[in-house]
Amino acid sequence: MLFLVISTPAPTPPSSVRDKRQLYWKWVQPLRDDGTVRAIYARIGRGAVALFDIDTLQTLHQRLNEWADIIPATFEIHPLLDVDAAQAFLTTSAQGSQAG
């Protein structure tokens, strides 16, 4: 399951969380390496945007709690369909509407 996660860190001075920010990148690297995080980008100012490929909602919950333990943040979460799944859905739904 694909999820786009946008983080907005708690409002603290960036210099006060510099070490935590470095720890965050060390935490996320193994997730990038194993494909759990397909892509990640730092946001201009503060925060990050990550594309998670997760097997269960419980796993997503675990990862977001790990993330928030390092850098307290609020998360905007968007479930996604990959292109192949979206096209398959459109094909199936078009066939269903033609059958009636």
Positions of the model-derived regions?
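Conserved, structured core segments of small domains
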Residues: 1-100
